[in-house]
Amino acid sequence: MRIETAIKHLESDADFLGMEFFDFIAFVKENPMAQTRKTIEAYAIFAIESKRAWDKVA
């Protein structure tokens, strides 16, 4: 899964639950067992790519 696809999936799940994107990211991090396998996969890719992007800044 590409980062663009991962973000789209996470955004659609957040919209479905009526949550803001970063609130949903925190929710997934705290409650991974309440998510689908695809959401966990998308979150993992988002987390890896976010860390990689911030490592370039620091």
Regions found by a protein language model. Name each.
Residues 5-58:
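Acidic, low-complexity, intrinsically disordered interaction modules
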